[in-house]
Amino acid sequence: MSLISAVEDRDIHNIGKTSGGGSRTSSITSSKKSLKHGSKSLRKPKVYQTTGEPLSREALYKAKLKYGVYQSPAQSYSIGVSDAHAASDKAANLAHDNQTTVEAYKRMFIDPNATKAASKMGPKVVRNNSITSATSKTSKESQTKRKSKESPGAAASKAYSMTMETTSLSSQTNSRSYSITSASSVLSGASGSFNSTVNPKPKTLNLEKVLVGAEKKAESRIKERWEPEKTNFQYGVKTDEHGNLNQFSFSNEMMNNIMAKVDAPKAQDLQKVKKVSAEKEAKSMKFALGAANAVKDMHPGEDIDKSIALKAQKRETYLSQLTSQQVLTLARANVDRQLDIIEKSDMHRKLFTNMEYNKAAVAVAQSNHQKKTEFHNKINMGGGLFLSPEDITKIASGLISPVLGEVSERAEAQRAMDEEIAERTEAYNKSSNEWETMERSIISNDAKVLTTTANRHQTEKKTSQEKIKASFDALVARMDTKVAERETLLEDTKSKEIEFKKQMQQELKDEKARLDQDLEEWGKKCEQDITEARKEQEELLKPYHDDLANAEAEHKTLVEERDEINAEISRLQDAIVDHKRKISGYGNDLDAQKNRNIREDDKLLELGQTKESLESHLNDDVIILANKAKEQAELSTKEARLKQLEVDSLINERKSELNATEIELKKEKLNLLEAMKDVASARGDDKIDEEKVKKLIGMTSEEYLTQNKSVEKNVEDLPTQLEKIEEGDELKKEEIVGAETKNSGGDGVPVSTAAKEATETSSAVQTKEPEEKISIGNKSSGKEDANDCKSAEHSKEISVSQKAGNNKSLGVSPDSLEHTFSGFSQGSSIEDDQDAISNQEKK
C-alpha cells in the first residue's frame, strides 16, 4: 500500500512538530480526529455513467493505470491532489479531458501541495513507540465507530493487511506495510493501553462469521462436485468455427497412449504436482482473504437478524446432513468408479491409423501455413494492421525521440524517490519492531486469561455434573415406582382379555349358524326369482324374434324381385339392339330409294314413263318411311321402359339394403335384450330396467309390443290391397287395348298424313292401285303398332304391380319421355300409356 496517504496538510504540520511519548500519542489522536472531521465533509463520487451509477472499482483502477495516477510507493506524486478521497474523481476527469495522443500519459494538473506533503512526511515522521495491531478491544471499537465514515478502499486495504499479518507473521516481519489511517487507529487504541496501569481483558475473537463464509464456500464446492459444469472440450486442429464442436474427439485411453510417447513424463508429473500445490495455496489464501472481506464491515457485538439466524441454522443442518462421513464415502466411491469408467472408455477412434483424420489435419495445416505466410515477419498492431519491424522503428523514432528528454528527467526523479523510500523503510522497520514487542505482551496476557478461564470452566463443570447426577438418581427412583404400578395394571388387563376372547368366540359361533340358515333361504328365493325373470324376458323377446323373421322374409322377396327386374332389363337391351339394327337397315333402304327416285325422275323425263309405274315407286318409298318410323317408336318405348326398370332396380336395391340394415339393427336389439336379461338374472332382479331399455331402444318393452302388433295387422292387410290394385290394372289394360285397336283401323290417320306429305313432294298424280297398296300398308302397320303397344303396356303393368307390391309409387312425367319419340303415329299409343300410368297412381 501507499506510504503517501490521505493526511491533510494541517495534520502533517502537527505530526511533524510532536516529539516524545505522550505528546506523540496526543498528536496522532488529533490527526485521527481531524481525519474523522474531514471524512464527514466528503462529497459523493461523481456520476459518469449514462445510467446514473458511479464508476466501478475496476473502471477506476484501469483509468489510474492508463493515465499514471495509481497509488504506488514507486512514485512521489502518487495521488496528485490534496484530498485522497477525491483522487478517483480527479483521475476520471483527467481521463475524460486529455486527448488520446502520444503525450496523453503526461500529468497535466499536479497540485504543488502534494509534493510539499511528500517532502514533509519523509524526515519528520519517526515512530519511537510500539504500535499494536487491531486485535485489542479498544482498537476494534474505534474501528467500528469509524467504519461508516471510511471509504470502501481503506477498509479493504486494512482487512488485507490484517490477513497478511496473521498468515505470515513469522516469515514477513520486515516486509509489512500499513496505511497511515490504520496506523493512526492502532495508535489511538494503543494510547489507552499505555495510560492504563493494567492490560484490559481482550475480547474473544468471534469466528462465527468467518466459519459461515467458509461453510458457504464449502457448500458451493460440494455443489460443483455433485453438479459439475458441462464444458465442451475440443481437441485436434483449431478452426475458425468456434460454435461447432470439432469432429474429432479423443478418449482418455487414446490421450494416455499419445502422452506415453513424450520423452520426459516424470518431469511433467512433477510440474503438475507443483502446479496443483501452488493452486491449493493460492485458493487457501483467496478463501482467507474472502472471509476477512466478508467480516470486515460487521460488528461482533451487534445482534443478528432473526431471518439471517434462521437461514444460517437451516444451512448448518443441511451441511451437517450433506457432509456426513457416510455421504462423503459414498460420493467418493461413486466418483472413483465413474472416473475409472471414463478412463477405460474407448471412443472407437484412433489418431495415427485414421486416414481421414490425417488427411483433414494435413489440409488444415496447409491452409494455416498459407494464411501465416501472408503476414510473415510482421507484427500485429491490432485492428487488422500488420507492420514490419522497419516500419515500426521508423514510427517509433519519429514519435518517441521527442519524449526521451522527459524520460531522462523522470529517471532522475525516480532515483531521488528511491533514496527517500529507503529512508522511510528504515524508519518504518524501527516502528514495526516496537509494534511486535507490544504484540508479544498482548499475546502473553491473552494466554494468562485463557488459563484462568479454563480453570473456572473445570470447576463449573464439576459442580454441574454433581447436580445432574443427583437429579438423575431421583428420576430413576420415580420411574421405578411408575413401572411397578404399570406392571400390576398389565396383569389385570391380560386376565380381562382372556375372558373377553372366550365370550367373543361363543358369539361368533351363534352368529355363524344364523348366517348359514339365512344364506340357504336367500339362495332358494333367488333361484325362484331367476326362473320367473327368465320366463318374463322370453315373453318380452318373442316380438323381436317374430319381427326378425318377417324382415328376413321381406328381404328374400325383394331379392327375388331384383333378379326378375335384372332379367327384364337384359331382355329389353337385346330388343333395343335388334331395333337399332333394323332402323339402320331401313335407313340404308331409304338412301337407296332416294337414289332410285332420282334415277326414275331422270328416266321419266327422258323416256316418258307412265303414271302407274311412277306411283308404284312412290308407294314403296312411303312404306319404307312408315316402317322406319315404327321401328323408331318401338325403340323409344323400349328405351323408356329400360330406364324405368333401371330406376325400379335401384329402388329395390336401396330397399334391400335398408331391410338388411333393419335386420341387423333388430338382431343387435335382440342381443342387447338377451344380454340385459342375463345381467338381470345374474343380479337376481325380477324385471329388466325399463329406463335403460328406453334410453337404448327409444321405447319401453310394452310400447314395443303394441307397435309390433300394429305392424302385424298391416302385414296381414297387404295381400288384399295388392289384389285390388291388380284387378284395377287389368281393367285399365283392357281399356287401353280397345282404344289401340280402334286407332289401328283401316283409315290409319297418322300414316296417311305421312303418305300425303311424301306424295306432295314427288307428284300430284294418283291411281287406284297405289291407293290400295297404301291402305294395305296402313293396315299392316296398324297391327304392328297395336302389338307394340300391347307389349309396352304389359311392361308398364309389370312395373306398376312391382311398385304396388312395395307400397311405393314412382311418378314419371310426360316431359321426361317426349324427347325420345319421333312424332309419328306411335305417339298416340305412348300418350295413352302415360295416361294409364297416371290413373293407376291416382288409384
UniProtKB/Swiss-Prot annotation:
Transmembrane segments: none annotated. Residues 127-137, 163-174, 798-810 have a biased composition (Polar residues). Disulfide bonds: none annotated. It is found in: Cytoplasmic granule; Cell membrane. Residues 752-764 have a biased composition (Low complexity). It holds the Pfam family Eisosome1. The keyword Repeat does not apply. Keywords: Acetylation, Cell membrane, Membrane, Phosphoprotein. Residues 1-53, 120-174, 717-843 are annotated as: Disordered. GO terms for biological process: eisosome assembly. Belongs to the EIS1 family. This is Eisosome protein 1. It comes from Saccharomyces cerevisiae (strain ATCC 204508 / S288c) (Baker's yeast). The lineage of its organism: Eukaryota, Fungi, Dikarya, Ascomycota, Saccharomycotina.
